[in-house]
Regions:
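Transmembrane alpha-helices and adjacent helix-loop boundaries
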Residues: 1-278
Length: 278
């Protein structure tokens, strides 16, 4: 052990930060870049898959070519969602990174592999989130859009998604927080994110407890700050509490950005005022 390494716990913490602060900084940068970009790409993937999975089938022409193609596409997308939601990201990372190299001779760099793995994993979860958000909006909204001549995609973009997004936003934030923490599994393919950088720092002086104490605090700070920023955005999206969010799922009313208790209290007060003649 290096003679310059202090013997007390806090002294070692200071020593590690002074000598390896840049390593932690680079690890933080890589972790946040992977989490932010991959969450965004995953949301885009989930958005389009969610829309496709909610395309209604023509029951009168059950075996038409269009219906058969739609069934095949939905089957493939559902398989993708179930497989990537039902397997650990670490296993997916190993399978994709080494599988592409072995089967297709595709050798990806650190960034490409990290973005691909986390994005498709997030996309599987967000697909179900978007599908649930779409279903939560009252079906009368869809029927009304069809009456005025909108197709399914126009209905989703202009009518359903603006309403569903307020319900979906908390889950998007949750996935970002999860990706910040779970990016550490990418160390198995050599991605030098925060966890991987910490292993290098800890191994230099065998200060595993001290190094990972620092990393634990860093992860907490990152997720705490992100959660507060996301909560601020959610509150901004709440907007005016003088209108009702159109949903058919009462559970949605009690979750996420929708302030159910405040809304119910406001409605009760207005009804009481009406009865009182105000």
């Amino acid at each position: 052990m290096d003679a310059s390494l202090p013997s007390d716990f806090w002294g070692r913490i200071v020593f590690i930060l002074k000598n390896y602060g840049t390593s932690f900084g680079r690890g933080i940068g890589v972790t946040m870049a992977i989490a932010l970009v991959s969450t965004f790409i995953g949301c885009v993937i989930g958005f389009f898959i969610g829309i496709i999975l909610t395309i209604p089938e023509n029951k009168q022409k059950k075996w038409s070519f269009k219906n058969i193609i739609l069934k095949i596409i939905k089957f493939i997308l559902n398989a993708y969602v179930e497989i990537f939601r039902g397997t650990p990201m670490m296993v997916q990372a190993m399978f994709i990174y080494y599988g592409l190299a072995l089967l297709f001779n595709v050798h990806m760099g650190m960034w490409a592999a990290a973005f691909l793995i986390v994005s498709i994993n997030t996309g599987a979860y967000m697909a179900e989130t978007f599908r649930g958000g779409i279903i939560s909006v009252d079906s009368g909204q869809t029927e009304g859009a069809k009456v005025i001549g909108m197709n399914h995609f126009q209905t989703m973009f202009y009518v359903i998604m603006p309403q569903a997004l307020r319900n979906i936003m908390p889950q998007i934030g949750n996935n970002l927080i999860i990706n910040i923490k779970d990016s550490c599994v990418l160390s198995v393919i050599g991605t030098v994110e925060l966890f991987y950088a910490t292993k290098g720092v800890a191994g230099a002086y065998y200060t595993y407890f001290e190094a990972f104490t620092i990393t634990m605090v860093i992860y907490f700070i990152l997720t705490f700050i992100c959660s507060k920023i996301l909560r601020f955005i959610e509150n901004k999206m709440d907007g005016d509490t003088g209108y009702d969010l159109v949903t058919k799922d009462q559970l949605v009313l009690t979750s996420g950005t929708y302030k159910h208790k405040e809304k119910m209290n406001d409605l009760s007060l207005r009804k009481a005022n009406k009865r009182g003649g105000y």
